[in-house]
């Protein structure tokens, strides 16, 4: 019997690519969106979900279980970017980012766990970011939210092993998606001391997304993980230099690594 897969944020970008690929491989895939009515032509059904609202999470999972009786794989893919000098990002926007990138996935995990525990099996894949392994200038909130999800994945994984439930983390680098269009950019003050350096960083970020990897790569990695009996804790996916940056962080003294990042971002 084919497995049922729930992908949050499955209406565009990496989520859509994963959903279409896994559907073509014979899985019963359900994606989510805050506005499912916009995606009536989707290759797989799109359920209504706002990961920042507990009632929406509960209703989404209940709707899926009423249709399928099971959730075999949860892919926490929904996320949002945020940039800006930490001094000038409104606190409310920082909290909003964590609601989507960190607390939202936790809410989804906790909502599907009773069903997975009952069937004594399940796989949860958290999509984070290579940026979560390091604090990046003008991306500090995003790095922190993704890094927090990476760490809590490790804790959840150990707690859930006795129930036959696996959890893993996929940290992608830059992929060619529309993520830049939905990214929150903190509005700078007219006399902000960060005007020039922040602008340079934004240009670099947008260039990297435009030249990013094919999202189909992520879809194929997920397919392989689903067929792996004991997935690794962490998967880093992306260009060689992006993955190597994580290795360098472990090998280099902190101040040397910091200088490398500052040079890269022209600071």
Segments predicted by a language model, with ranges:
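Active-site helix of classical SDR
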Residues: 109, 145-148
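Substrate-binding pocket helix/loop in short-chain dehydrogenase/reductase
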Residues: 85-86, 90-95
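N-terminal Rossmann NAD(P)H-binding glycine-rich loop of SDR-like oxidoreductase domains
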Residues: 11, 15, 19
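C-terminal beta-strand-loop-alpha-helix "lid" module of Rossmann-like NAD(P)-dependent dehydrogenases
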Residues: 161-209
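A short, exposed helix-loop element centered on a Lys and neighboring polar residues
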Residues: 109-110, 154
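Residue(s) in the substrate-gating loop at a strand-loop-helix junction
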Residues: 129
């Amino acid at each position: 019997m084919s497995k049922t897969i729930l992908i949050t944020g499955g209406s565009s970008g990496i989520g859509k690519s994963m959903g279409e690929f896994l559907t073509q491989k014979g899985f019963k895939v359900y994606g989510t969106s805050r506005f499912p009515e916009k995606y009536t032509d989707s290759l797989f059904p799109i359920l209504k979900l706002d990961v920042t609202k507990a009632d929406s999470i509960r209703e989404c999972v209940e709707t899926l279980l009423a249709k399928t009786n099971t959730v075999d794989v949860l892919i926490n893919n929904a996320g949002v970017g945020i940039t800006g000098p930490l001094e000038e990002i409104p606190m409310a926007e920082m909290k909003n980012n964590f609601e989507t990138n960190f607390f939202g996935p936790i809410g989804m995990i906790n909502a599907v766990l009773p069903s997975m525990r009952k069937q004594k099996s399940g796989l949860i894949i958290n999509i984070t970011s290579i940026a979560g392994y390091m604090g990046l200038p003008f991306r500090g909130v995003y790095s922190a939210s993704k890094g927090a999800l990476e760490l809590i994945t490790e804790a959840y994984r150990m707690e859930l092993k006795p129930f036959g439930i696996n959890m893993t983390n996929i940290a992608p680098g830059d992929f060619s998606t529309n993520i830049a269009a939905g990214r929150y950019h903190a509005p700078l003050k007219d006399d902000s001391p960060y005007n020039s350096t922040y602008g340079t960083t934004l240009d670099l970020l947008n260039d990297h997304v435009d030249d990013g990897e094919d999202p189909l790569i992520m879809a194929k990695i997920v397919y392989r993980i689903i067929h792996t009996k004991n997935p690794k804790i962490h998967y880093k996916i992306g260009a060689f230099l992006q993955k190597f940056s994580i290795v360098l962080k472990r090998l280099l003294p902190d101040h040397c690594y910091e200088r490398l990042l500052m040079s890269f971002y022209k600071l």
